Amino acid sequence: MASRQDLGKRPSGPDCALVRGLPPRKHGHPRSGRCCLAGSGQNRTVRLERNATQSALDIQELYDTKLFHLPWNQAVAGRPPVPDDVSSAARHIRNRGPYLDWYSIELGDTPWPGDVLLCQRQSAVWSRRDHHAYGTFLAISGSAWALSIVIFALVRDMTLLTFLVALFLPSTPALLDTIELAQSHWQQSTKRRQVEDDIHDVWDEHQDRPGDVPVQECRRLQDATYLLRRDGPPVPNWFYGLRRRETAAVTNDGTATLRSSSDPT
């Protein structure tokens, strides 16, 4: 059974620092005619980034399963990372202070595995809110940029041909990337909402006796979380930091409401 102290010793947020700290995926539009060396270098960078992401996901999954006392699901996550790789990754974190109290919700006397369910809920809610907010930020930023180049063209009294050649066409790849990335964050937010709703269904069924929550249900929800972390776009650290305090307060309030509904009084 995970103790209250154990469940509190994690950085406050949806995903571990190793995952959040990775650079954002780059969406490029390579043009024909560029040398093969550049394409090879880009592919190598993508492979390295993918390997680093997978390693971080596996380490976080190992941490979660140890913290939550859940069995490792090799069918979903493959083999667990070896201790040497975990130690090597941990050495890249210079300041560990900001990464304490990850599951910052107050669990009180909620028994295991009900407390695990509440922590999984905080992860789902946190990620759902951040992905939706960042997708909206990208959409607004892209719209503002598109509007700014139109205004610039009007102020400069550009002809349509000049506007297309000098501003619109060069900006199109970046604008399309922004739209695509915003949509992917909104889709990720929707998927996190589905997991969140699933968690609520399990909690509602066992809210009178949280200790009777089936462990296999927690494992199933953990699998869903792992797959979303693996396939979803990352939220930048700076954006996460701007929202951290507010989201922590919101998820604490939500957890307190759920816990109060399970109290016999």
Go through each PLM region and give its residues.
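Membrane-interface amphipathic/juxtamembrane segments adjacent to transmembrane helices
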Residues: C36-V86
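Charged, amphipathic alpha-helical oligomerization/scaffolding segments
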Residues: D58, L62-T65, V116-C119, S123-W126, ...
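Short, non-transmembrane cytosolic segments of multipass membrane proteins
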Residues: N73-P111
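Membrane-proximal soluble regions of multi-pass membrane proteins
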Residues: V76-P81, D115-Q122, V215-R230
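Membrane-proximal, non-transmembrane alpha-helical segments
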Residues: G97-Y134
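Long, hydrophobic, amphipathic alpha-helical segments used as structural scaffolds
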Residues: R128, H132-G135, A139, W203, ...
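Cytosolic/matrix-facing juxtamembrane and C-terminal tails of multi-pass cellular membrane proteins
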Residues: A182-S260, T265
